[in-house]
Amino acid sequence: MSSVVVVGTQWGDEGKGKITDFLSEHAEVVARYQGGNNAGHTIVFNGVKYKLHLIPSGIFYKEKICVIGNGMVVDPKALLVELKYLHDRGVSTDNLRISNRAHVILPYHLKQDELEEERKGDNKIGTTKKGIGPAYMDKAARIGIRMADLLDREAFKEKLERNLAEKNRLFEKMYDAEGFNVDEIFEEYYEYGQQIAQYVCDTSVVLNDALDEGRRVLFEGAQGVMLDIDQGTYPFVTSSNPVAGGVTIGSGVGPSKIKRVVGVCKAYTSRVGDGPFPTELHDEIGQQIREVGREYGTTTGRPRRVGWFDSVVVRHARRVSGLTDLSLNSIDVLTGIPTVKICVAYKYNGEVLDEVPANLNILAKCEPVYEELPGWTEDITGVKSLEELPENARHYVERVSQLTGIPLAMFSVGPDRSQTNIVRNVYGI
């Protein structure tokens, strides 16, 4: 039995898709366990760039099973768009499996997400407005509609009628907005369900059978630890658990079956949306990192906020996700910067903090304590081993591993999967 979890250690956009794609080569099953189409990942496969939001990165390998787990929330309309996107490019999706227990995002979730953000004004969370939060709210309130319901004409109609009676009252009374017609949503989305029915099954059985047979299973996290609803910078977080512990809940696989956890981070930090960001850069270096690193959201297109590498954040991720291995991406983006900095602690009211404070008012006032290292000017995009890196770049990578306390397993010097280099094999093969 060999299972590996890939999680983001920052605020998402760390390059998890590329690392998952890279690790997929030796995996036999690839599964997502939380989130929805609010997560965007860019994958370069055979020289072609693909942008996915729902479907696991392993979809490009026909012989590998790809799983959308029960912990995800699925917009059937968005899923069908993504399936067509792949089919139009000659990519088969016969290897896709969708949990019959995954919850469904419906039009009223999208509308509620948008209206609530507008209502909050300056206090908005900065959601992607994909209906993720409202769908998870309904799940917690036990009124959600699952894939199994979507495929059952009678059950879907009954639950939709009940939910819309409440949702339409909410739209009219709280937001002064029009509600939805039950029949229109029912006919449209029941048809969507029929189009994806071939993929729907009990994915917990699929995953556990694979593990019991000794097959290699890769679990692909979305977003990042700092966006985790429990361990992140709450309330500026997503509505699910990207931490490694989310695998057991979101896939139906027991914790004893998780063997390795790879934490993915960039050589700097980025963030989309609102919330505290201690190492954020507002100067020319920040702009340089944004442009060279192409720091614009895959899902939203919004410019990402960027800053220096924060070892306090990644140490937090190591602790709450039990990270066993580190994957450091985008080292090449820092090339040409004379002095590079790593945040080693925070300072608040004269006190040095080694951990991320839960109180966001405190976090917002924290000043980063930096360690400065000499930069490098050499082109490193063709480097194939740690030893080939220029001395200053190699020292930077080693220092990140030391400060975070996570052994380095791989590092990347560019966006293509061929620019990802293995230091040690996470599958133990």
UniProtKB/Swiss-Prot annotation:
<dbReference type="GO" id="GO:0044208">
    <property type="term" value="P:'de novo' AMP biosynthetic process"/>
</dbReference>
<feature type="binding site">
    <location>
        <begin position="330"/>
        <end position="332"/>
    </location>
    <ligand>
        <name>GTP</name>
    </ligand>
</feature>
<dbReference type="InterPro" id="IPR027417">
    <property type="entry name" value="P-loop_NTPase"/>
</dbReference>
<dbReference type="InterPro" id="IPR033128">
    <property type="entry name" value="Adenylosuccin_syn_Lys_AS"/>
</dbReference>
<feature type="binding site" description="in other chain">
    <location>
        <position position="302"/>
    </location>
    <ligand>
        <name>IMP</name>
    </ligand>
</feature>
<keyword id="KW-0963">Cytoplasm</keyword>
<feature type="binding site">
    <location>
        <begin position="298"/>
        <end position="304"/>
    </location>
    <ligand>
        <name>substrate</name>
    </ligand>
</feature>
<dbReference type="InterPro" id="IPR042109">
    <property type="entry name" value="Adenylosuccinate_synth_dom1"/>
</dbReference>
<feature type="binding site" description="in other chain">
    <location>
        <position position="128"/>
    </location>
    <ligand>
        <name>IMP</name>
    </ligand>
</feature>
<feature type="binding site">
    <location>
        <position position="40"/>
    </location>
    <ligand>
        <name>Mg(2+)</name>
    </ligand>
</feature>
<feature type="binding site" description="in other chain">
    <location>
        <position position="223"/>
    </location>
    <ligand>
        <name>IMP</name>
    </ligand>
</feature>
<dbReference type="Pfam" id="PF00709">
    <property type="entry name" value="Adenylsucc_synt"/>
</dbReference>
<keyword id="KW-0436">Ligase</keyword>
<comment type="pathway">
    <text>Purine metabolism; AMP biosynthesis via de novo pathway; AMP from IMP: step 1/2.</text>
</comment>
<comment type="function">
    <text>Plays an important role in the de novo pathway of purine nucleotide biosynthesis. Catalyzes the first committed step in the biosynthesis of AMP from IMP.</text>
</comment>
<comment type="subunit">
    <text>Homodimer.</text>
</comment>
<protein>
    <recommendedName>
        <fullName>Adenylosuccinate synthetase</fullName>
        <ecNumber>6.3.4.4</ecNumber>
    </recommendedName>
</protein>
<feature type="binding site">
    <location>
        <begin position="412"/>
        <end position="414"/>
    </location>
    <ligand>
        <name>GTP</name>
    </ligand>
</feature>
<feature type="active site" description="Proton donor">
    <location>
        <position position="41"/>
    </location>
</feature>
<feature type="binding site">
    <location>
        <position position="13"/>
    </location>
    <ligand>
        <name>Mg(2+)</name>
    </ligand>
</feature>
<feature type="binding site">
    <location>
        <begin position="40"/>
        <end position="42"/>
    </location>
    <ligand>
        <name>GTP</name>
    </ligand>
</feature>
<keyword id="KW-0342">GTP-binding</keyword>
<feature type="binding site" description="in other chain">
    <location>
        <begin position="13"/>
        <end position="16"/>
    </location>
    <ligand>
        <name>IMP</name>
    </ligand>
</feature>
<feature type="binding site" description="in other chain">
    <location>
        <begin position="38"/>
        <end position="41"/>
    </location>
    <ligand>
        <name>IMP</name>
    </ligand>
</feature>
<keyword id="KW-0479">Metal-binding</keyword>
<comment type="similarity">
    <text>Belongs to the adenylosuccinate synthetase family.</text>
</comment>
<dbReference type="InterPro" id="IPR001114">
    <property type="entry name" value="Adenylosuccinate_synthetase"/>
</dbReference>
<feature type="active site" description="Proton acceptor">
    <location>
        <position position="13"/>
    </location>
</feature>
<dbReference type="GO" id="GO:0005525">
    <property type="term" value="F:GTP binding"/>
</dbReference>
<dbReference type="GO" id="GO:0005737">
    <property type="term" value="C:cytoplasm"/>
</dbReference>
<dbReference type="InterPro" id="IPR042110">
    <property type="entry name" value="Adenylosuccinate_synth_dom2"/>
</dbReference>
<feature type="binding site">
    <location>
        <position position="142"/>
    </location>
    <ligand>
        <name>IMP</name>
    </ligand>
</feature>
<dbReference type="GO" id="GO:0000287">
    <property type="term" value="F:magnesium ion binding"/>
</dbReference>
<keyword id="KW-0658">Purine biosynthesis</keyword>
<feature type="binding site">
    <location>
        <begin position="12"/>
        <end position="18"/>
    </location>
    <ligand>
        <name>GTP</name>
    </ligand>
</feature>
<dbReference type="InterPro" id="IPR018220">
    <property type="entry name" value="Adenylosuccin_syn_GTP-bd"/>
</dbReference>
<keyword id="KW-0460">Magnesium</keyword>
<dbReference type="GO" id="GO:0046040">
    <property type="term" value="P:IMP metabolic process"/>
</dbReference>
<keyword id="KW-0547">Nucleotide-binding</keyword>
<dbReference type="GO" id="GO:0004019">
    <property type="term" value="F:adenylosuccinate synthase activity"/>
</dbReference>
<dbReference type="InterPro" id="IPR042111">
    <property type="entry name" value="Adenylosuccinate_synth_dom3"/>
</dbReference>
<feature type="binding site" description="in other chain">
    <location>
        <position position="238"/>
    </location>
    <ligand>
        <name>IMP</name>
    </ligand>
</feature>
